Amino acid sequence: MKITCIVTILALLSLASKAQTQGINKNYNAQLAKALNADDYGMKKYVLVILKTGSKSDLPKATRDSIFRGHMTNINRLADAGKLIVAGPLDKNALNYRGIFIFDVEEIEQAKALVETDPVIKSNLMAAEYLSWYGSAALKETLKIHSTIEKVKP
């Protein structure tokens, strides 16, 4: 009976030890995780913004062109400030979605304040939908990498 109990205890301790070490990433970089505000899963909260066709569409071409130049300038400003992590257009679609932004902010209100600085939003050429999104904290590194592969800056 004593031997059975001892063997059972040793087996349970062995299983508990394996459970604790299982899933631990050998490549884990605590300093980088902290710098990127990553949680234990390497993830963090962002705000995903879907840009869609707005209520204003009858502007002269010269005005639209000027607004879109301002839009690109604003994108670059927000990216340079480290707030805008991903931005890009979408192909034509039935939902009239035009593009996306992913902001390195946790609250939708913070993203709204940033989006409201964009000329396409101010002019109502586009409107925005906001969603909280939980994704890889490494996404923030995209900007550093992108700047090394971008031959022409828009």
Label each region the model flagged:
Residues 20-154:
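Conserved, structured core segments of small domains
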